[in-house]
Amino acid sequence: MVNFKINGTSFELSGSEKVNLPLMVCSHERSGTHFVMNSISKCTEYTANPFLNFDYSPLGSLINFFSEESIRIFLNSLKNIKYNDSINYCTNSIIKSHFPLTLLGNDAKNLCKVIYIYRNPEEVFISFWKFLNRWDWFEGPKLNSPLELMKSNPKGQSQRYQVENYKNYFERWASHILIAKKEQKNSKNIVMVNYSDLENNFSKTIENICNKLEINIISTPSKPNKEEYIFGKDLKLSYEEKQLMKSFIREEIQKFPALPNDLKELFN
């Protein structure tokens, strides 16, 4: 563990001689980010304790998140963390990000390895609705249902991850995934994974991720404890409200034919 310092700001990171590129886990909010981070942490040299939150807190004074050059300089610095004034290691602290992958620029393959996780929008928006209602600041609109949230235009602090304005949160969610899909075509260092694959075929999915990204598995993959997740407010949703959600998603998802088939097939 090292107290990594850059431009006067410091934060705790782990480093390892056994990794050569940082690992980023990226997603739209509430898509299983911590699930995959903690899963990888339990069976590889990468660790989620501590992880690095790629966000304005703690990095707002260090990075222009909308500058490819600024991001490149920062991520390159994570490949050369000095230990004991002599040894340089790459960080093995997993980088958590909700920014769209396009902001990594054309050099993404040389900057880091990326796991992009996506999830059934019904599950995403139930969780996101509870998450936004949890905070005492304006992270986003505190509405009466996830259906209202999907229909609402993005507001509050949640807008910090956007490169453009969106008609509603559903369009924002779909666009985030479509950007990742486009970026994956240009880099062998980006792997997309469906949350349901981790739920239903955990070990095989983790092995596939690690094989594609050339990450060494050092222990048998095992699911992390639920206590390690971040929960939203305890809110209840009726069966009728869930059915209205499904109907809305079934109609809206047709507007984004390039979404992964395993998402579209859920609402045929």
Task: Describe the predicted segments one by one.
Residues M1-L23, N133-D136, P146-L147, K155-K167, ...:
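PAPS-dependent sulfotransferases, especially Golgi type II membrane carbohydrate sulfotransferases
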Residues G32-Y46, M192-I217:
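PAPS/PAP-binding and catalytic site of the sulfotransferase fold
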Residues M1-I87, N225-Y229:
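PAPS-dependent sulfotransferase catalytic core
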Residues K109-K113, N186-I190:
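Short glycine-/polar-rich loops that comprise or flank the Walker A/P-loop
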Residues L101, N120-V124, L198-E199:
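Conserved nucleotide-binding/hydrolysis micro-motifs of P-loop NTPases
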Residues V25-H28, I95-H98, I117-R119, N194-Y195:
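Short His-Asn-centered micro-motif
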Residues N84-L104:
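Glycine-rich phosphate-binding loop used to anchor ATP phosphates in small-molecule kinases
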